[in-house]
Swiss-Prot record:
Organism: Homo sapiens (Human)
Membrane topology, record value: Single-pass type II membrane protein
Domain THD, residue spans: 122-261
Gene this chain is encoded by: CD40LG
Subcellular location: Cell membrane; Cell surface
GO molecular function annotations of the record: CD40 receptor binding; cytokine activity; integrin binding; protein serine/threonine kinase activator activity; tumor necrosis factor receptor binding
Family annotation (InterPro entries): CD40L, TNF_CS, TNF_dom, Tumour_necrosis_fac-like_dom
Family from the record: Belongs to the tumor necrosis factor family.
Main function: Cytokine that acts as a ligand to CD40/TNFRSF5. Costimulates T-cell proliferation and cytokine production. Its cross-linking on T-cells generates a costimulatory signal which enhances the production of IL4 and IL10 in conjunction with the TCR/CD3 ligation and CD28 costimulation. Induces the activation of NF-kappa-B. Induces the activation of kinases MAPK8 and PAK2 in T-cells. Induces tyrosine phosphorylation of isoform 3 of CD28. Mediates B-cell proliferation in the absence of co-stimulus as well as IgE production in the presence of IL4. Involved in immunoglobulin class switching.
Outcome, altering L258S: In HIGM1; decreases ITGA5:ITGB1 and ITGAV:ITGB3 binding of the soluble form; decreases activation of NF-kappa-B signaling
Medical condition linked: Immunodeficiency with hyper-IgM, type 1: Immunoglobulin isotype switch defect characterized by elevated concentrations of serum IgM and decreased amounts of all other isotypes. Affected males present at an early age (usually within the first year of life) recurrent bacterial and opportunistic infections, including Pneumocystis carinii pneumonia and intractable diarrhea due to cryptosporidium infection. Despite substitution treatment with intravenous immunoglobulin, the overall prognosis is rather poor, with a death rate of about 10% before adolescence.
Extracellular topological segments: 47-261
Name under which the protein is recorded: CD40 ligand
């Protein structure tokens, strides 16, 4: 009987770093990270400190310069005449530059103010107002959402806008009327934008017409007029209609205005 003997192979030793080595690597990593953070913080502190030192040095130089000027004025013998003359010359140059810059700034501000005064914004927007008069010229009032920018444009006699400055103006008008009221004739309803210049006859700038309607209840129709015209100082513009009794004076229906371009 043959007995076989199998010898078991020895177990392989566990691979990997020892615990002491792992601890050392961990501490080294923490140290490096801490050192980088500390270096960054120190760099920021050093930069701010250098800026502060630079400011203090500049202030100190300014103080020394002003102190030297004071000593030159008091006539202290510790300074030579040549140094005093040179320092005074530098100081006078600085003061001269400051005064010139100040004068230039004042001139620029004054020019801007004069420019604004020379080209003020001129605008007007007025609302229609019912009138018992039978005149064909529509009446207007400064009410509701009206605009009257300044005294360079005025509403005179409640019927015409008068400008006091020459220039190009955009003039507009909207007239809303009831088209099915009994009219004296079958002629269309006509709205005209008219100009009255000093020493000249009245003339029509724009005109629009709309036909009557038999629709009931009252059929509202609107006429729009608008254009750009050259106006002289003292010129007046107004709106003329064929039948003012048909004009609707409700909110936003009929309005009139101008704007200087």
């Amino acid at each position: 009987m043959i007995e076989t003997y199998n010898q078991t192979s020895p177990r392989s030793a566990a691979t990997g770093l020892p615990i002491s080595m792992k601890i050392f690597m961990y501490l080294l990593t923490v140290f490096l990270i801490t050192q980088m953070i500390g270096s960054a913080l120190f760099a920021v502190y050093l930069h701010r400190r250098l800026d502060k030192i630079e400011d203090e040095r500049n202030l100190h130089e300014d103080f020394v310069f002003m102190k030297t000027i004071q000593r030159c004025n008091t006539g202290e013998r510790s300074l030579s005449l040549l140094n005093c003359e040179e320092i005074k010359s530098q100081f006078e140059g600085f003061v001269k530059d400051i005064m010139l810059n100040k004068e230039e700034t004042k001139k620029e501000n004054s020019f801007e103010m004069q420019k604004g005064d020379q080209n003020p914004q001129i605008a007007a927007h007025v609302i229609s107002e019912a009138s018992s008069k039978t005149t064909s010229v529509l009446q207007w009032a400064e009410k509701g959402y009206y605009t009257m920018s300044n005294n360079l444009v005025t509403l005179e006699n409640g019927k015409q806008l008068t400008v006091k400055r020459q220039g190009l103006y955009y003039i507009y008008a909207q007239v809303t009327f009831c088209s099915n009221r009994e009219a004296s004739s079958q002629a269309p309803f006509i709205a005209s934008l008219c100009l009255k210049s000093p020493g000249r006859f009245e003339r029509i700038l724009l005109r629009a017409a709309n036909t009557h309607s038999s629709a009931k209840p009252c059929g509202q129709q609107s006429i729009h007029l608008g254009g750009v015209f050259e106006l002289q100082p003292g010129a007046s513009v107004f709106v003329n209609v064929t039948d003012p009794s048909q004009v609707s004076h409700g909110t936003g229906f009929t309005s009139f205005g101008l704007l200087k371009l």
